[in-house]
Structure formats: C-alpha cells, structure tokens
Amino acid sequence: MRKVGMLMVTALAASLLAGCGYKASDKKEEVTITVFAAKSLNQVMEELIAEFQKTRENVNVQGSYDSSGTLMVQIEEGADCDVFFSAAIKQMNQLDETDGLVVEGTRHNVVNNQVCVVTYKGSNTKVTGLMDIKNAGSIALADGSVPVGKYTRQAMVNAGMLEKADDVSKISTTDISEALGGVEINECANVGVVTSAVAEGSNEVGTVYYSDTYGLEDRLEILEKIPYDLTGDVIYPVAQIQNSEADEAEATTAKEFVDFLITDDAKEIFQKYYFDTDVED
C-alpha cells in the first residue's frame, strides 16, 4: 500500500507541474561572456552592454577595461576573453595576423575617435594646442604602448616636434621632455589616468580622446582637436577571440555581441559619446 501511495503522490505532482506549464528547459542557464575593451570605451560600453542584455535575460556581459596594449598581452597569455575591442589597429593585427587568435569573419572597424589637447577648467594655461604644448607647467601623457600615447607621438613626429622613428611607440617620455625643453611629463598607464590627472588639476594639460571628455564638460576644456593628418585615423576594431574555455552558447553570444556593435542602434549610442561612426569596415 505504501508503494502504491507513493506512486499516486508522484503522479499527482507530475500532473500539477504539467498543468502549470512547467518544463525543465524553460529555465535557461545564464550565459556569461567577457569583453576586453580599451579604457576609452568604458562609458559607452556600459550603455551598449545594458542595451544588448535588454532582450537577453539569461545573458551576462562582463566588461574589462585597460589600455589596448595591456589587454592584448593578457589575451596572448591566455586570459579568458571572448571579445576584444581595441583603440588601435596595431593590437588587433597582432592578435589576428601574428597570433591567429581572432575568429575568422568577425573583425570589424567600428568607430573613429580624435586626439585632443585638454586642460582643466580655469587653468589659465598659455597652451593653445599641440604645437605650443611645451609651454605647459606639466603634461599628462600616456606611454607609447597605449594607443593615445602612440597617436600623440605620431602627431609630434609629423609636426616636426620629434625626430622620426621606425616605431614611434618606443619614443620615451624622457625623449619627449627633452625635445620640448625639459617640461615635466607624467607618464600614465592608460588614457583614463591621463583624463583624471588633468580633470583633477594634477597636470596642466594632457592628450586624451574626444570621447574621454564626455560627461566632463564642466571640468575639462578642449584646447585643440589634433588634425587627422598628424595622428592618422584613430580606428577602433572589434573581433571575437578564440576562447578554448567557451562553450557553444558562449561562443554564439560573443558573435551576437560583435554583430550588435555594428548595428544602427549601437551607432546612435556611440555618437552620443562623441565617437564618429562614419568609418569603412
């Protein structure tokens, strides 16, 4: 009798679950992907991630932000990364053409940015732009492995302020200081550190991206947007990364996120944060 009773209870429970429309497959497991993105993308990426997740309740996109050079090295060393969004083509080329870590067919040029010379509000600086930046009391400058630091060095070379070099990223801040008459230079690990150093008044001027001034309009003054003929285009490429730890659902979601970043909806968000979306893919 006890066995029959148990069978009846089990059958009743099963019928109740069926009546409620319950299916084990209805509850999807959470899918988490990791996106490595340049520090200058921090603000816009948070909104892009939120927008992407709106229609994907089981998806969690985790952003990790630093200089593109630092992130590239982490990926090469085996860090768990599904998508890489770089502030320069150089680092993406390294992962793609040299390391073979980019998933074929997923690489896209997404946005363009512009390097600016900035100062803090009320600084009364005598600097008007790149050509007379030596007149500053101090300069916040990203190191050469950081894209904004490389673009700044390239602009200085093209403007005749620095001697030509086979690899401008190797030009040290000491070399730059000497070329500019001994001005004090604060070497920074990424563009976010440069932005903070100037906005807080720790350094008189610095070079950042136009997008880095978003939300800081009351603290930063743009002295000059450096022309593209000095820096070259500041293209941001994105791609899915070969991740041996990712399962099929994670790999699919990573590809979907890359595809989302080149949609019209994403472009509107990029433009809000001062990025130029008129780029050739």
Residue ranges of predicted features:
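Sec-dependent N-terminal signal peptides of Gram-positive bacterial secreted proteins and lipoproteins
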Residues: M1-A24
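Exported/periplasmic ABC-transporter solute-binding proteins
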Residues: C20-A50, K54, G69, I89, ...
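A generic structural motif
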Residues: R56-Q62
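Ligand-binding clamshell of periplasmic/extracellular solute-binding protein-like
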Residues: G63-V73, D80-E97
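CheY-like receiver
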Residues: Q74-I75, A197
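Short glycine-biased active-site loop of nucleotidyltransferases that positions the nucleotide triphosphate
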Residues: E76-E77, H108
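A short, gly/pro- and small-residue-rich
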Residues: T98-T106
